[in-house]
Amino acid sequence: MEKTFPMTKEGLDKLKAELENLKLVKRPEVIDRIKVARSYGDLSENSEYEAAKDEQAFIEGRISTVETMIRYAEIVDNAKIAKDEVALGKNVTFVEVGETDEESYQIVGTAEADPFTGKISNESPIARVLIGKKVGDIVDVPLPVGEMTVKIVKVD
């Protein structure tokens, strides 16, 4: 059985847009650069050609990866999950016990995780601890050194 990629509908749409961009924009651009670099002659010492071929390999690999993620995407449906329960696709806000600063993240599938925009993977240590918990629960979150105790204050 193939691995599934749990994700939100938004994440799937983003992957489809990336795939379209890779196939319709990036792939043709790199093919054109390869043609231009070939016209310079001797390919054995042609750094432009080598760079374009490397980029082409990266683009083709990314296309393959994205196609696989789309093919085996599993869209989450939170309709059957309690409103105050942490689950993939939901936003969770928590506060470290004894502190006042709240932190909020959306739990998403690995394919759409981006910590810089507040989206953390459901496979991350913090998400694994939070998933299934409810507002008011106090949990220990593992850190690289030790752990921190947090209270879930909001789920939406």
Swiss-Prot record:
Q: Name one GO biological process term.
A: DNA-templated transcription elongation
InterPro entries membership: GreA/GreB_C_sf, TF_GreA/GreB_CS, Tscrpt_elong_fac_GreA, Tscrpt_elong_fac_GreA/B, Tscrpt_elong_fac_GreA/B_C, Tscrpt_elong_fac_GreA/B_fam, Tscrpt_elong_fac_GreA/B_N, Tscrpt_elong_fac_GreA/B_N_sf
Q: Which SUPFAM superfamilies match?
A: FKBP-like, GreA transcript cleavage protein, N-terminal domain
Q: Which PROSITE patterns match?
A: GREAB_1
Ribosomal protein among keywords:
no
- Give UniProt keywords alphabetically: Coiled coil, DNA-binding, Transcription, Transcription regulation
Residue stretches in coiled coil: 2-27
| MF GO annotations | DNA binding; RNA polymerase binding
> Tell me, what's a Pfam family for it?
GreA_GreB_N
Record-linked NCBIfam families: greA, PRK00226.1-1, PRK00226.1-2, PRK00226.1-4
The record's similarity note reads:
Belongs to the GreA/GreB family.
Q: What is its biological role?
A: Necessary for efficient RNA polymerase transcription elongation past template-encoded arresting sites. The arresting sites in DNA have the property of trapping a certain fraction of elongating RNA polymerases that pass through, resulting in locked ternary complexes. Cleavage of the nascent transcript by cleavage factors such as GreA or GreB allows the resumption of elongation from the new 3'terminus. GreA releases sequences of 2 to 3 nucleotides.
Name of the featured protein: Transcription elongation factor GreA
Organism annotation? Lactococcus lactis subsp. cremoris (strain MG1363)
